[in-house]
């Protein structure tokens, strides 16, 4: 029956798109740096929508940085230390610059963009797409380790 076959194909296509979406090209990189230095967590947009320049970076537990056009939000503890410049974002570069690294900054960071989608009968809607995951490691330089040990002795 043609109707049953059509429904079956539709379901198969939906499952394939769900699986491909879940396995899409989300890369995980590792970045490391010493305490007090600056780390750049790489990120690049696949396409740039200059009408709604949006990027969000977060850890598993909190929003680190968010930009919507000129407006920005810096998460608690990250104030004055994080940025994705509007100019770079217009070029499709969404790398997070994290200054004055702290040991507590170590962890996995994820970047998200907003994508507009339009259905056949639905109005345009937006959904967030994961762009990248970055594992940040922060270490204490050997000379600072010696200074800490000497101070506690």
What are these regions (language model features)?
Residues 10, 36, 62, 103-106, ...:
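Disulfide-stabilized cysteine-rich extracellular repeat microdomains
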Residues 38-44, 81-135:
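Ligand-binding face of N-terminal immunoglobulin V-set domains in extracellular IgSF glycoproteins
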Residues 46-81, 119-120:
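N-terminal V-set
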Residues 10-13, 17, 41, 92, ...:
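Secreted/extracellular small peptides and ectodomain modules produced from precursors
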Residues 34-38, 50:
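Short, surface-exposed loop/turn motifs at beta-strand boundaries within globular domains
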Residues 1-31:
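N-terminal Sec-dependent signal peptide, specifically the hydrophobic helical h-region
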Residues 14-26, 58-63, 118, 126-152:
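Flexible inter-domain hinge/linker segments at boundaries of tandem extracellular adhesion modules
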Residues 27-34, 45-46, 150-152:
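Short beta-strand segments of immunoglobulin-like
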């Amino acid at each position: 029956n043609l109707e049953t076959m059509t429904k079956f194909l539709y379901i198969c296509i939906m499952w394939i798109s769900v699986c491909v979406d879940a396995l899409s090209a989300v890369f995980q990189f590792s970045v490391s740096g010493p305490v007090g230095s600056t780390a750049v967590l790489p990120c690049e947009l696949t396409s740039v929508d200059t009408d709604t320049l949006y990027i969000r970076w977060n850890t598993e537990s909190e929003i680190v940085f968010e930009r919507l056009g000129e407006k920005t939000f810096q998460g608690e503890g990250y104030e004055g230390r994080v940025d994705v410049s509007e100019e770079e974002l217009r070029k499709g570069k969404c790398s997070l610059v994290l200054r004055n690294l702290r040991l507590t900054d170590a962890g996995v960071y994820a970047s998200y963009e907003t994508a507009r989608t339009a259905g056949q009968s639905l109005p345009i809607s937006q959904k967030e797409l994961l762009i990248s995951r970055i594992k940040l490691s922060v270490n204490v330089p050997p000379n600072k380790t010696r200074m800490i040990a000497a101070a506690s002795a």
